[in-house]
Amino acid sequence: MAMYLELSRPKGDVSRWEKVLKRLNLLNKNYPLENARCGYNSFRRGFENNSPNKDNQAEIYDIARESLISQGLVFFGGYANDLYSHYMPKRQRKKNKKFPDFDVLSERPKISATILKERLEDAGFKKVKISLKKGVGEVIAPHYEILVGPETIAFIYEPLACHSYNVIHIKGKPIKVATIDTMLSFYLAFIYANRPYYDRDRILCMAQYLFMVQQKNRLEQKGLLRRFSINCVGTQDTLMSVREHKAEMYQKLKSKR
């Protein structure tokens, strides 16, 4: 997880990338991500059959997707995984079902969640709620869950570093999609977070699928498959900022020794 995280931060210490990448390749060669139970169907969660909004999930998907795109947020969940599946053989591609299941990065997650809630309410949907979830140490920031009735449709996270992404265009609209290294760093963190809303097996399958995409297209370095992008979302701590923070804390605490 830490190695993927380091490779996903273009404003970090990039001088270490070559060494980290060599070690990561060696690790993946000997201990690849594998789960024999994984299939190639959609990894996104659909609504339950008895859900009051079962017949409206395609409309909710369209509204949520357009709202998140228009806000310029970075996709890294099931929707992003589906976009990467286009670079696999046809038999291994995932069906593009309109399941409203999004994970995105936003530098203003509360505002982004509120905007999405308002768009859904403007379309006539009731019981739209925003639920704040606690973070997990310095790995996962506090995040917002958006629900329509009992169904979760999105999680919006604040980045804890500057995470890399690529920009693609679909029907003339720019869409920000996290790099595979960014996505894997989050997925592996979710697996060990021990939260009830993180399906460990599902996330492991998503991580395995992304690893397959990356290995099959490792020589492709353009568009969505560009691995080392300079575009990133969030604020990255630098050596200078760490030293400044250390000096501030020293001045603040020196009289309490």
Regions found by a protein language model. Give the residues of each.
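N-terminal regions immediately upstream of nucleotidyltransferase
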Residues: A2-A58, R257
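Structural boundary micro-motifs
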Residues: D13, W17, Y197-D199, I203-F211
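Eukaryotic intrinsically disordered, low-complexity regulatory regions enriched in Ser/Thr/Pro
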Residues: T179, L204-A207, Q214-R257
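Charge-rich, solvent-exposed alpha-helical interaction surfaces
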Residues: V20-R23, R119, K252
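Active-site nucleotide-donor binding segment shared across nucleotidyl transfer reactions
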Residues: Q57-K110
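Conserved catalytic core of two-metal-ion nucleotidyltransferases
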Residues: R119-S164
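Phosphate-handling catalytic interfaces
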Residues: Y165-Y198
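Short, conserved charged micro-motifs
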Residues: K110-K117
